[in-house]
A protein has these predicted regions:
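Short acidic-hydrophobic, aromatic-tinged amphipathic segments that line or gate anion-handling sites
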Residues: 161-164
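VWA/integrin I-like adhesion module and closely mimicked acidic/polar interface patches used
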Residues: 99, 117-157
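Von Willebrand factor
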Residues: 1-60, 67-107, 110-114, 141-153
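Short helix-terminating capping/connector loops at secondary-structure junctions
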Residues: 40-44, 101-107, 135-137
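Short, well-ordered amphipathic alpha-helices
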Residues: 28-36, 87-97, 126-130
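Short beta-strand-loop
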Residues: 43-72, 151-157
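P-loop NTP-binding core
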Residues: 4, 33, 101-103, 124-125
């Protein structure tokens, strides 16, 4: 059966500490609980968690929903969105199964990017690479949290931007 890869690209910078991080953790848990009630999602959805602050790190590689458990999110300094995007693109390249003449690949991945700040690294190259090579391969939904979220930077990546 074809998989539906869902990547969560989560800002875990110091500004997310406290209530924002708690809400993020609870939101992940509620989403997973909701998806687990859908038999089709149980068979097709694979989840991955990538956390970023100054650097990006995969906390959970793509794993089937039935065995997924939301990891504890670490806190770091900086909001390295450029590094996070590069890491995400590498994960898409290595973990998403492509369609070949012999078999159907994965469904188009969905990426949920959540951040509450302004990038602290240069995002220009990563944004260009995303737009050129990945924008058609994956559906990205960006969520800006709070009054300091850089919505302009998020709009460079996707037209699907939500501000909370």
């Amino acid at each position: 059966m074809r998989r539906l890869p869902i990547f969560f690209l989560l800002d875990v910078s110091e500004s997310m500490a406290g209530e924002n991080l708690r809400q993020l953790q609870q939101g992940l848990e509620r989403l997973v609980a909701s998806l687990r009630t859908d038999p089709y999602a149980l068979e097709t959805v694979y989840l991955s968690i990538i956390a970023f602050a100054g650097k990006a790190k995969t906390l959970t590689p793509l794993v089937e929903m039935a065995v997924f458990y939301p990891p504890r999110l670490p806190i770091g300094s900086g909001t390295g969105l450029g590094a996070a995007l590069k890491h995400l693109m590498s994960e898409i390249d290595s973990q998403v199964i492509k369609t070949t003449p012999e078999r159907k690949g994965d469904w188009k991945p969905i990426v949920y990017l959540m951040t509450d700040g302004k990038p602290t690294d240069d995002i220009k190259d990563a944004v260009y690479r995303w737009q050129k090579n990945y924008q058609q391969k994956a559906e990205l939904i960006a969520i800006g949290v709070g009054q300091y979220a850089d919505l302009e930077a998020l709009h460079k990546l996707t037209p699907h931007v939500v501000h909370l």
